[in-house]
Amino acid sequence: MPASTGVATRALRPARTVVRWAVRHGLPAVYLDRGARHGDPVGRLLRDGAVRDEPYPLYEELRARGPLSPGSIGLVTPSHAVASEILRSDRFGVGWDRSQAPRPIRWALAFGDELDATGVAEPPSMLVVDPPDHTRFRRLVSRAFTPRAVAAFEPVVQRTADSLLDALELRSGVVDLVETYAAQLPVLVIADLLAVPAERRADFLRWGAAAAATLDPGLPFRRYVAAERALRAMHAFLREHMARLRRDPGEDLVSRLVSLPEDEALTERELHATVMLLLGAGFETTMNLLGNGVVLLDGHREQWEALRAAPSGWDGAVEEILRHDSPVQITGRTATGTVSVAGRQVSPGTRVTVLLGAANRDPDVFDEPTRFDVGRPNARDHLAFSAGIHYCVGAGLARLEGVIGLRALSERFPALRVSGRPVRRDLQTLRGFEHLPVQLR
Ligand code: HEM
């Protein structure tokens, strides 16, 4: 790029930031706030802090309205059957046709477009692209997550958990289990998978938290600016990291992605989107699984004791934690054609908010759904990892980390108790704890 163009680009950066925020967060916030004021459940869910802390009563209100009801931005479903149908349907996609958007929005999207400010839920992240691009990205990534590849990760996860627990042995009094364990384990495991230096983990945690915030629509301007700063730092790191692995490749997933043969090679933007998604999705969700699990088991002490006595039950326990308090609560799809769902005609372009956390408490599928029971026979029928072509590619690894992480913790600190008030993260799409004070002994 000529120097003058670079200077011009930098000079436009603040304006771009404002436009990007306005179109991605400012405008949705106006709609959602208006909806919330008129009692719209989706508006309340996404905009009301009290509902964010405890969304389950609102899900039940929605369930009473039926399996698919109108909200401020399209339709919304709390139903397991409808969510499964939509997530698996080829009449729904994750992308949206920008060419159909009003002209000012198209202009804003084009003007605000910049690789280094792109978040994990923006194209070309595989989370938000449809086939054939989705198929292409997914095929490349899923090679690293075959059952055999995940099983090979078991010693890494165990070793990482053990060394974190060794460090915890030296602590006394109340410790924050998120900071010392629940966040550390997944970030170290994903660092290993992507060959990123473990010393940078504090940066990843900071960047990941900012990236996670951008998943929620309607972010206030200041939080967006902070998030964008973190995204820029993350992209700068990725650029360096990929250049290093191009020069000196290893056996890891990123080395493989940057040295694909020409006919499969990803563009620079696609590489950034893919690695950034893996990095963020790899720990932002799993830390919630661990934190939510500890709090649930602390509240159901007899089940913690039963798992200590019979550790083979941890597989089922992790499924029940995922079901009962799902780390990802919300996703969405857009109808690509006219389609009939739950007796309703859905027209092309209609957005459906899919409440995974509500589907996982659907009484048509789960007996007494609010009861937490690690022995629940069909807990694994949950949609915590979604369904269809976007089904979580890292589900096997997440399950492994959940089982090893919680089992190892219970073995090392059998008397562990939550001590003080756990603090929820200020997020809607992801559900987990920011702080989790515990007494280890
Ligand atoms: C408890 C932990 C986790 C949960 C609850 C979770 C949940 C999810 C969900 C719900 C989706 C799909 C969203 C949708 O359908 O719109 C998803 C997609 C994805 N997850 Fe996970 N995830 C977890 C851990 C992981 C891990 C450990 C990794 C990677 C190492 C990962 C990588 C991905 C990727 C790359 C996608 C996009 C897949 C696609 O679009 O085809 N996740 N995850």
What is the predicted role of each segment?
Residues 1-441:
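Cytochrome P450
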